[in-house]
């Protein structure tokens, strides 16, 4: 019999699952009644903070996100709590000064976070250095994420090279962050095997069901040796969210990868979340379109959240009929901007520029400041060079920086 290697699971229902399906609108009061049972499961961790939860709590729910974190920490006695952190962008959409990054990391860990998953939208590791260093200083677990995407520059050698650098940075683990559901099953197997051979760190896999491949990709990744997978309780699984926790637990039952999780307990947790899902469906907060398979994410390499944002932008402009034109424009803009992964904030920047290019009838006639900042190097270095003609049209002869963008930012704590 094969050697036992129980698969570990990070539960996303309190963060990415509801962020992906109901625009991050789950309230603290909706979370608290079930966390005692969730604490009994034996999860590797529960992702419950960071990402869009901070913004959404303040902007839409009128909640204090710090109070949410403290209440969750109080309720989870045994389970590690995890957050998503946008590197130098913290939980925002632009780079902040080092002192702000350090302070935010310190406060996150002090208020209850154990594991910080840190990523950069360009995979520019310089934008992660401060957050990783701060996490280590506070005795937190620093997990660095590879923002996974497709393109001829993104070879296995590319990912292996970055993974080795991440290990050298002092990270505690690596996450393959497949925010668009682009990682198909056999590619998942190849990538996990390559990373496991190249580095000694635990490897975690995060994906979305958007393209319909996620569960199959998890199966192949687990067989290839991945250590942890991200899953969501079934009422908030599938579609633009993650594979269902209960399904993955059952899949590996009786195999060397058996998690040992109690399905009866998981069913009780699922029963709690089901009425919340039904309520979201009835109110329109949960759009049924977000629950199906969207093959366009593979064709256009656009994450599910970005698809819904594009639809919303075009509806507000009275230009819903331009949707497919914009979808076709997205890969072109992405190529012009150095072919970055499409994840916050690069997904918003590329998407908005694509909309403007189509609506204005002329490419780069209207250029937001964020696009200019990308082309000026103020978000970091991309895997490929910028389109020189586009760069000239957008920023003229303005200086293009090649050093770490945050080196230009004066300390901000005194003015915040």
Residue ranges of predicted features:
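Active-site beta->alpha loop and helix N-cap motifs at the rims of alpha/beta catalytic domains
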Residues: 50-167, 174, 181-185
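Glycine-rich phosphate-binding active-site loops on the catalytic face of alpha/beta enzymes
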Residues: 118-121, 178, 224-241
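Catalytic cores of alpha/beta
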Residues: 154-166, 211-227
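C-terminal helical cap(s) of enzyme catalytic domains, especially alpha/beta-barrels
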Residues: 237-259
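N-terminal amphipathic alpha-helix/helix-capping segment at the start of soluble metabolic enzymes
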Residues: 1-22, 72-74
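Terminal or standalone catalytic/regulatory effector modules within metabolic enzymes
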Residues: 37-57, 287-297, 301-416
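Conserved, mostly hydrophobic/aromatic
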Residues: 9, 17, 38, 118, ...
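Short, well-ordered coil/turn segments that N-cap beta-strands
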Residues: 4-7, 42-44, 77-81, 112-115, ...
């Amino acid at each position: 019999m094969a050697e036992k290697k129980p698969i570990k699971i990070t539960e996303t229902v309190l963060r990415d699952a509801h962020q992906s399906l109901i625009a991050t609108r789950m309230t603290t009061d909706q979370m608290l009644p079930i966390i005692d049972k969730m604490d009994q499961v034996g999860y590797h961790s529960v992702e419950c903070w960071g990402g869009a939860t901070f913004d959404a709590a303040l902007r839409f729910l009128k909640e204090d996100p710090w109070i949410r974190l403290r209440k969750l920490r109080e309720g989870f006695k045994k389970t590690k709590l995890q957050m998503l952190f946008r590197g130098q962008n913290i939980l925002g959409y632009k780079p902040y000064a080092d002192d702000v990054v350090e302070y935010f990391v310190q406060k996150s860990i002090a208020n209850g976070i154990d594991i910080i998953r840190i990523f950069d939208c360009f995979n520019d590791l310089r934008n992660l250095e401060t957050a990783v260093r701060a996490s280590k200083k506070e005795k937190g677990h620093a997990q660095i994420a590879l923002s996974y995407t497709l393109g001829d520059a993104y070879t296995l050698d590319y990912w292996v090279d970055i993974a080795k650098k991440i290990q050298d940075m002092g990270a505690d683990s690596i996450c393959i962050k497949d925010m668009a559901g682009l990682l198909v099953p056999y590619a998942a197997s190849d990538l996990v095997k390559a990373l496991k051979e190249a580095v000694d760190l635990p490897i975690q896999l995060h994906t979305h069901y958007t393209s319909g491949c996620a569960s199959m990709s998890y199966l192949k990744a687990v067989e290839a040796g991945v250590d942890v997978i991200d899953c969501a309780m079934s009422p908030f699984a599938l579609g633009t969210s993650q594979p269902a926790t209960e399904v993955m637990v059952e899949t590996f039952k009786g195999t060397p990868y058996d998690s040992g999780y109690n399905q009866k307990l998981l069913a009780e947790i699922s029963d709690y979340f089901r009425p919340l899902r039904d309520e979201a469906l009835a109110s329109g907060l949960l759009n049924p379109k977000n629950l199906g398979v969207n093959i366009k994410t593979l064709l256009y390499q656009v994450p599910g959240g970005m698809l819904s944002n594009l639809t919303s932008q075009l509806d507000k402009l009275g230009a819903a009929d331009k949707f497919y034109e914009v979808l076709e424009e997205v890969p072109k803009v992405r190529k012009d901007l150095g072919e970055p992964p499409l994840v916050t904030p690069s997904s918003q920047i590329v998407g908005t520029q694509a909309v403007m290019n189509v609506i204005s009838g002329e490419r780069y006639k209207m250029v937001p400041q964020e696009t200019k900042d990308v082309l000026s190097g103020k978000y970091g270095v991309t895997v490929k060079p910028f389109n020189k003609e586009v760069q000239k049209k957008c920023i003229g002869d303005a200086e293009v920086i090649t050093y770490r963008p945050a080196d230009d930012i004066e300390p901000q704590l005194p003015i915040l």
